[in-house]
Amino acid sequence: MQWQDQAWSKDLWYSGKVDRRRFLGLSAAAGAVGASMLVPPPWRDAFGQTRPYKIGALQPLTGAAASGGRMALIGTELAVRRINASGGINGRPVELVVEDDQSMPDAGRRKAEKLATTDRIDAHQGGWLSDVCLACMKVWENHGIVNMIGVCLDPRITTTRCSRYSFRPFDYAPAQAVAFAPSLIKMAKRWHIVYADYTWGQSTRDSFANEIKWHGGEVVGTTTIPVGTADMTPLLSKIGGRFEGLFGILYGADAITFAIQAHDLGLTRKYRWAGEGSIAISMNLPRLGAKIEGFVGIDRYLPVFESTLDTPYHRKWFAEFIEMTKKSAPGTVAPDRYVQSNYEAMNFLRIGMQRSGFRGRADTQKLIEALEDLEVHAGDDFPQGDKKLRKEDHQAFTDQFIFEMRSGRHRILTRVPWSETVQPPACRFA
């Protein structure tokens, strides 16, 4: 089934959306005929024939990362709805041009090229899997398109592979590791890391291993999990030895499989278990049930009203998400970090376009300059909190929340301010 035919996408609007209901008409040559009609943009009445900004949104809507890609796209759509409802950007509406990268780098590169050449987008906001983001960065650069990333965490995006055209307005693994390592060492001195065998998992493994060692701990072993492994038992059953902590770095269906099978093997009771927050995102919780109990994680966003997340603007944004998704997702899950980061990324892009007087690709350099060192504050557009897009590498830093799963809910143990997670820039723009 194509992503456009799935229930979650029914209430979204994107360029080229078709009403697939069949309309009947009469013809002298043929009897009743079926037809499909383009769904008009919801902003047409307000903006008339004003030329919209075309913003590309490349996400994994099928394949291994599809569940996360859907949440990411919902975050972008939520921001675009609010932008258009409040007058657009520079008096022009925003039109989303959505493409599915199928969770594969080669497909992502082809779709990025299509967005750049066929669809002629003005800017791009999206990207979920790090290997896809890395594969597409040269496309955006070659066509002079600003790329505001929504999810990808691989450190190379803003370090050794950085680009003047790409921005990451949220955290990355080195910042997470700096924030979490002191707590991990209190839980256990010796750790075994289980990680997804692709760029994000590998780089996150390295970041946490380095920080654990720097704080006097030790990583005594690692277990590599190929993406899409349905039965991890043969791999997990080999885990043993002298260590006290089990650390997981997985996402999507693999995160669910890991948590369930590690629990069933007794690993999560034998060892203190912790991990990257993607294991315990809200969409995973219904399937994990009680088996996620006691998990300690770190994330930039949690769907709770605690600590600095207990604000009127977070509650308002949370309610807007629930209202937007309740028709297509009965028993709606709460928003997660993928919704949050794409929502805020689109708002970063909006502010940059407004401040630069951006009209289209010819103004890309002006847009880049407006985004560099752009500082934003917590509010309706940035419910997660304050942050700044650093000029030197186009990297932002965010507050980090260390949490424990109790009775199926995230409970914040401590908040680490973004200022305590800052890493020195390691980027040299070409």
Language-model features: locations:
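Segments of small-molecule ligand-sensing domains
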Residues: 324-339, 350-412, 427
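Extracytoplasmic "Venus flytrap"
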Residues: 56-77, 99-105, 128-129, 196-201, ...
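Extracellular/periplasmic Venus flytrap/periplasmic-binding protein
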Residues: 110, 155-156, 163-265, 308-315
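Extracellular/periplasmic periplasmic-binding protein-like sensory domains
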Residues: 262-343, 356-358, 415-429
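N-terminal secretory signal peptides
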Residues: 1-22, 36
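Periplasmic-binding protein-like
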Residues: 115, 120-128, 148-150, 192-195, ...
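Beta-alpha junction/loop-to-helix N-cap segments that form part of ligand/metal-binding clefts
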Residues: 67-72, 89-159, 169, 225-232, ...
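C-terminal segment of N-terminal export signals and the immediately downstream linker at the start
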Residues: 16-17, 38-64
